[in-house]
Amino acid sequence: MSRKKSNGGLRFQPAGGNRATQIPVGKKQRLLIERVAGDGRGIAFIEGRTWFVSGALGGEEVEARVLGARGKVVEARLERVFQASPERREAPCRHYARCGGCNLQHLPHDGQLALKQRLLAEQLQRVAGVQPEEWAAPLCGPEFGYRRRARVAVRWDVKQRQLDVGFRAEASQDIVAIDDCPVLVQPLQAIMRHLPTVLRSLSKPQTLGHVELFSGTAEAVLVRHVAALPAEDLARLEAFCREAGAQLWLQGEGDPAPVDAAQRLGFALEPWGMELAWRPGDFVQVNAQVNTLMIQQALAWLAPQAHERVLDLFCGLGNFALPLARQAREVVAVEGVQAMVERAEANAHGNNVYNARFFQADLSQPLAGAEWVAEGFSAVLLDPPRDGAYEVVQGIARLGAKRLVYVSCNPATLARDTQVLVGQGYRLKRAGILDMFPQTAHVEAMALFEAG
């Protein structure tokens, strides 16, 4: 199907040659929203097309403006509510109407949790044909002030000769000017309030790529630049970070590095008295409170005993592996990136953990042949990326594990992998959502499988 522009809108030419009715960008349409989709958008049906409307709730009568269309699918943004859902609330953030960072602030937190629970249950039923024997209560932290890392968009506007600083608009490369964000942790909110002014004051702002903010055992500002920073601009950034009590990191063509080579970043796992080192670019859960609850629940569900060996797949920096090692006889932890394996090993030694072994392996391939596979395990923990762990779970039963905890950031791939595990004789004993990203439709979940 080819796509053509016409009169500021979109025109589609089906392969058969019959021209589809034009749906111009910007067109407004009155709609009745039937339900909410998995990505948090309202769904409506009219004239043979499916409309996805961001900002709309089930049962509402709304007016929506077209953002784009393709075939029988139209993407739109809420413009006006004629008949509101009783669940609707005024979004707490003043930037919500334009910023693309959050998409569920118009729904109270209890409603967000119910939506995510429903989406997980629907995926498990539709794809795997199962429901858990028991639903666990959602794991929740604060609905605002939770995010400990953020990427700030920066772009030099050649025509206006000004620096745009903020977050991306929904479904757009436009930058919404923002100097406050209520989902950030308080230390990052304080930095964000002054960051745009500082960046715009630089003598060569066009050298900037983007900026990342981090909060853990210390705060950090990472400035990515496409050309060398003038000395005066570097001095200005250093002064800003000193005043904010934050580290300054820079990244040009190489890896990120602190301006002060002695500085380090880390995050605490307080219940276990641990501190894990990490660097900008490493994966780390953005929600510290829910991360702690998640680890505690995973350990409770796996219940590793002092004589047991546990396998941790997609181990990252050791977020699960190190607490697991406090309870199990031995933990074998596997990660796909060698640099992460080395940092996880360093984290283990830095926390006096010596019963965890770390290996690099391509976990997009079947496990057969790896040196650690033949050793056998009592329990397995998986924390894969959005693609899931399809190749890994194909042979998971051969490891001999009686208990398996699967931490998922994508209900669709969790459901797909659940079907495989059930086919190998595992029961879906328990499942529940992890509210890692309040105010968004992003669903994280944990599932416990037991053999037999």
Curated annotation (Swiss-Prot):
E.C. code: 2.1.1.190
Keyword Metal-binding: yes
Entry-linked Pfam families: TRAM, tRNA_U5-meth_tr
Region feature Disordered, mapped onto this chain: 1-23
Binding-site residues, S-adenosyl-L-methionine: Q285, F314, N319, E335, D362, D383
UniProt: [4Fe-4S] cluster binding residues: C93, C99, C102, C181
Catalysis: reaction(s): uridine(1939) in 23S rRNA + S-adenosyl-L-methionine = 5-methyluridine(1939) in 23S rRNA + S-adenosyl-L-homocysteine + H(+)
Molecular-function GO terms, alphabetical: 4 iron, 4 sulfur cluster binding; iron ion binding; RNA binding; rRNA (uridine-C5-)-methyltransferase activity
Keywords recorded for this protein, A-Z: 4Fe-4S, Iron, Iron-sulfur, Metal-binding, Methyltransferase, rRNA processing, S-adenosyl-L-methionine, Transferase
Taxonomic superkingdom: Bacteria
Top enzyme class: transferase
Leader peptide range in chain numbering: none
Task of the protein: Catalyzes the formation of 5-methyl-uridine at position 1939 (m5U1939) in 23S rRNA.
Protein family according to the UniProt entry: Belongs to the class I-like SAM-binding methyltransferase superfamily. RNA M5U methyltransferase family. RlmD subfamily.
Protein name as annotated: 23S rRNA (uracil(1939)-C(5))-methyltransferase RlmD
Organism: Pseudomonas entomophila (strain L48)
